[in-house]
Amino acid sequence: MNKSLPIISTSLAWLLAAFFLFGAYGNAFISEENAAAYAAWGYPGWFHYITAILELAAGLLLIRAATRPYGAGLGAIVMAAASLTTLLNADYSHAVAPSIVLLVSLVVLGLSLAVRRAAN
């Protein structure tokens, strides 16, 4: 195994964890603009709390190598839902960011599983 793979995997995972932790904060203490977006997409007023909890869980799971694949998988599911929501509502300007984070989550998932396999 490439010796830099665990370093790359960990670094990317921690950056992704930071994204999800900041996202959780932003969804827990939602701005008026984001609340309006959730309403326009048809979600109930409390749904941003569900998003915040899921993003918090993904962020925390990404920190430790043992739980990293679960965090990356959960993050990928959350971002797939966000991408699908924006695309189905033709809100294309908001579709790019969750799509990129979905891709990064899948890369972290693949890298973390490769590192885990190589360690065993």
Protein language model annotation of sequence segments:
Residues 54-60, 78-83:
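Hydrophobic, membrane-inserted alpha-helices
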Residues 45-53, 57:
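Interfacial helix-start motif at the membrane-water boundary
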Residues 1-25, 49, 65-120:
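Extended, low-polarity transmembrane helix blocks
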